[in-house]
């Protein structure tokens, strides 16, 4: 679960000890954390570098937590990174452009945005790709069913921007997606946790009028048999061209 503690190693070790005993009593032989109860793409891990205002779904923990975990004996299991790039032509990787152009010379491949799709097409394509793209044996990652996809898109609806969702197809079959949203912490911090009355008005104002300048890469997937061919590059390039050439709202892209 999550971890909160004052700046006192003894207090931290008391919490760790209690967790360890609880797990041992239930037959567990290892302990990991801090983790969110759910998929590992949301609020997992301990922040060890880059103590700046966090982006949506990124954990924020105090710097003094790091030695608590290390001194108790925790070691890295896997590392997660957040990257930021400026959305200008100069920042576009030549490799991304080359891969995209090479792939799209084959007319069997097609990249389209959410604007060109119906919600039903997007949901069905997402479900197909997700369950082909992710290694279901990877720790913390599971498959999705139709009901979960419906819930996901219903949750995204208030913040969905059609310019931030891209899908790849091969001979009409869905093979990849790149799902982004506006960086939500920019909006949420003005609402102060109160999504009602004035809070709703503030949410709508900062979502649609005084909009943020950062797009957040939420989830990326390419069907396993099409990985390594440049499909991901083609989706990234399509998004960047759309934003840069049409001078859309966003100046930055954050990805994890």
Predicted regions and their residues:
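Acyl-donor binding region in acyl/amide transferases
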Residues: 1-73, 191-256
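A conserved beta-strand-loop-helix scaffold within acyl/acetyltransferase catalytic domains
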Residues: 4-5, 112-222
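Conserved beta-hairpin
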Residues: 17, 21, 25, 70-72, ...
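Short beta-strand segments
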Residues: 32, 84, 167-169, 179, ...
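Short catalytic/ligand-binding loop motif for oxyanion handling, primarily in non-cytosolic enzymes
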Residues: 39-43, 77, 91-93, 176, ...
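Acyltransferase donor/substrate-recognition loop-hinge adjacent to the catalytic core
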Residues: 59-140
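Sequence-level motif detector for i,i+2 pairs with an aromatic at +2
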Residues: 78, 106-109, 175, 212, ...
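Short loop segments at secondary-structure junctions
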Residues: 86-90, 171-172, 225
